[in-house]
């Protein structure tokens, strides 16, 4: 059965799942090239100069990014959620509707992994090279990638809440 919920805009959405080792290795190479582009684009805004560096535990995020870079080719399955249509020239309403629908699907997918002992994270850096990834996987150019999700067994199941800003700092 279907494991993901969809929003009101239920146009064509798909989860492209890849478990072929050679293809995953090529995907990892594209991801790492895109990460190099991202790092170059940040310029001096890295390390302690990064905007998020003041968030408690932010060094763990950097460590996780580096670990994923080094081990992405070893992940059992990589998933790219896609939806039909491009948002670049769409109205704000249509953009929000398209993204709002795929976000529900992806979040449901990630929650469905948990009781199976699996986990993932939402990565977007490959989008610097979305066309290259699409060509590798045969994804039509009129589909938008919503991210890249490495899927693997978790190390334990004792997940804890992450640090969050106090609610009075985020509500207007």
Where do the protein language model's features map onto the residues?
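N-terminal amphipathic, basic helical "cap/leader" segment at the start of enzyme domains
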Residues: 1-72
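Small-aliphatic-rich amphipathic alpha-helix that forms the alpha element of a beta-alpha
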Residues: 1-3, 79-135
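Helix-biased detector of long, well-ordered alpha-helical tracts
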Residues: 46-50, 63-67, 77, 82-93
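C-terminal helix-cap and adjacent tail motif
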Residues: 144-172
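Short, electropositive alpha-helical surface patch
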Residues: 131-146
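Short, surface-exposed beta-edge/turn micro-motifs
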Residues: 12-13, 75-78, 145-146
């Amino acid at each position: 059965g279907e494991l993901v919920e969809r929003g009101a805009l239920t146009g064509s959405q798909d989860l492209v799942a890849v478990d072929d080792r050679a293809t995953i290795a090529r995907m990892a190479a594209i991801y790492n090239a895109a990460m190099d582009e991202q790092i170059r684009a940040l310029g001096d805004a890295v390390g302690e100069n990064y905007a998020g560096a003041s968030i408690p535990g932010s060094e763990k995020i950097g460590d996780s990014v580096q670990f994923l870079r080094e081990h992405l080719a070893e992940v059992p399955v990589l998933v790219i959620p896609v939806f039909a249509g491009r948002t670049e020239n769409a109205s704000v309403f249509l953009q929000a509707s398209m993204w709002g629908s795929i976000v529900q699907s992806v979040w449901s997918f990630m929650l469905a992994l948990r009781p199976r002992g699996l986990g993932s994270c939402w990565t977007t850096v490959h989008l610097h090279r979305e066309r290259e990834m699409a060509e590798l996987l045969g994804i039509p150019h009129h589909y938008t990638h919503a991210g890249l999700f490495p899927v693997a067994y978790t190390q334990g199941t004792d997940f804890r809440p992450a640090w969050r800003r106090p609610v009075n700092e985020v509500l207007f």
